[in-house]
Amino acid sequence: MNEKTIILANPRGFCAGVDRAISIVERALEEFGAPIYVRHEVVHNKFVVDNLREKGAVFIEDLAEVPPGATLVYSAHGVSKAVRQEAAERGFRVFDATCPLVTKVHKEVARLDAQDCEIIMIGHKGHVEVEGTMGQLAPGKMLLVETVGDVAKLEVRNPDKLAYVSQTTLSVDETKDIIAALNARFPNIRNPHKEDICYATTNRQTAVKELAEQCDIVIVVGSPNSSNSNRLREVAASRGIDAYMVDNAGYLQRAWFEGKNKVGVTAGASAPEVLVREVLATIRGWGHETVREGEGAEESIVFVLPKELRREGETKPDLCKR
């Protein structure tokens, strides 16, 4: 009889950008007291957001909800230039929790625009990161593509002055297909200096592919509005096995595991390890008692906090190396 085993993906859970964003809100609360206003959910995870709300964070979408002189934090997903300008005009104390890898894309957009390139954004319409990146330029200046099919519909000013950037949390495989379609239609399109999909997204997708090869079912811990968590579930499902995404252990269904000997568990980049442990406890209680860690890429990158929120010893260069 096959042993009932749970295999944990590595890496999984929090990435450096999420760690930094949560720390910025927590440090701001410690330094300046509640309330601290946060534009949009600082990361897309219900547990994290609820926990910060209990500590005094107030999550808003419209800066009109923020009183004069208040402290405001931008979410990890980044904001448009219009939001930055409005915050400056209103005189808020601002801390920017935008992931540095998203900021890198913003800088790439500015550089390309200065060179008079028309820019195509590969991403999901309505996602806050996409809105922030496209908002680095005036409305209508960037073109959005979500699928390979969208590439054929593009109308560009000059195919020889064209470039693309990507949302950082996309499926690596799907994005490759879109990039291939762009290069086929526009042979002179400029590629980013460095891949836009972040290291954490890539590493977690690679790990879940390996997990899917070993397991009968994969559980992804993540909130429904988390782009990278959704992509993990899709990647696992594309391997032909059952794959489910759950916000926490309460969403697990015992019937999913009937007849399944090997269960894979991973977590999106915004999902804390405490939720993974609760999921493990529930599945173990249903008979999958053996747990082992999978092998995968080691991650050592740490992004430093804004200087106003740093503590002694947090300015060393080795704290932000890969």
From Swiss-Prot:
Q: List, alphabetically, the GO terms of the cellular component aspect.
A: cytosol
Tell me the gene name: ispH
**Catalytic activity, EC:** 1.17.7.4
Annotated dimethylallyl diphosphate binding lies at: 44, 77, 127, 226-228, 270
Task: Indicate what this protein is called per its UniProt record.
Answer: 4-hydroxy-3-methylbut-2-enyl diphosphate reductase
Q: Which family does the UniProt entry place this protein in?
A: Belongs to the IspH family.
The residues that hold isopentenyl diphosphate are 44, 77, 127, 226-228, 270
* Positions contributing to (2E)-4-hydroxy-3-methylbut-2-enyl diphosphate binding: 44, 77, 127, 168, 226-228, 270
Catalytic activity field: isopentenyl diphosphate + 2 oxidized [2Fe-2S]-[ferredoxin] + H2O = (2E)-4-hydroxy-3-methylbut-2-enyl diphosphate + 2 reduced [2Fe-2S]-[ferredoxin] + 2 H(+); dimethylallyl diphosphate + 2 oxidized [2Fe-2S]-[ferredoxin] + H2O = (2E)-4-hydroxy-3-methylbut-2-enyl diphosphate + 2 reduced [2Fe-2S]-[ferredoxin] + 2 H(+)
